[in-house]
């Protein structure tokens, strides 16, 4: 299990995913109000002029999408760091046990 975590960690470190979202993720909220004509046609004429443009600007100004993408990248890396630390601690304990066995054998001679 720890070897798998180390391999995943190395792959993530070598193939860094950009911190900014992919442009297609940015296009979805912007195009959403324009692609639903039923919601636009049900509004009053004054709302139709300001409705889609206002919702488009609000969705673009919202940092929610950027935060969600960054968190989804940070959480696995944080978990992998914890797994890496646990693997290092286990390896250090195993090495200490091996060293103790070697010293015990040398001391018996």
Swiss-Prot record:
Cystine pairs: none
Gene Ontology molecular-function annotations: corticotropin-releasing hormone receptor 2 binding; corticotropin-releasing hormone receptor binding; G protein-coupled receptor binding; hormone activity; hormone binding
Biased composition (Polar residues): 51-60
PTM statement from Swiss-Prot or TrEMBL: Glycosylated.
Bias type Low complexity, positions: 33-50
Valine amide carried by residues: 106
Key words, A-Z: Amidation, Glycoprotein, Hormone, Secreted, Signal
Cleaved signal peptide residues: 1-22
One record GO biological process: tissue regeneration
Residue ranges listed under propeptide: 23-67
Lineage: superkingdom: Eukaryota
InterPro entries: CRF, Urocortin_II/III
Pfam families referenced in this protein's UniProt entry, alphabetically: CRF
tRNA processing found in the keyword field: no
Subcellular location: Secreted
Segments for region (Disordered): 24-60
Protein purpose: Suppresses food intake, delays gastric emptying and decreases heat-induced edema. Might represent an endogenous ligand for maintaining homeostasis after stress.
PANTHER family according to UniProt: UROCORTIN-2, UROCORTIN-2 AND 3
Family the entry assigns: Belongs to the sauvagine/corticotropin-releasing factor/urotensin I family.
Name of the featured protein: Urocortin-2
Organism: Rattus norvegicus (Rat)
């Amino acid at each position: 299990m720890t070897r798998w975590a180390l391999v995943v960690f190395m792959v993530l470190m070598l193939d860094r995913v950009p911190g900014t979202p992919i442009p297609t993720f940015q296009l979805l909220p912007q195009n959403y109000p324009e692609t639903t004509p039923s919601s636009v046609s049900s509004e009053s004429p004054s709302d139709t002029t300001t409705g889609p443009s206002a919702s488009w600007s609000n969705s673009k100004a919202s940092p929610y999408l950027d935060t969600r993408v960054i968190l989804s990248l940070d959480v696995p890396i944080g978990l992998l760091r914890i797994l890496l630390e646990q693997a290092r601690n286990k390896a250090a304990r195993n090495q200490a046990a091996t060293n103790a066995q070697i010293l015990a054998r040398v001391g018996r001679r």
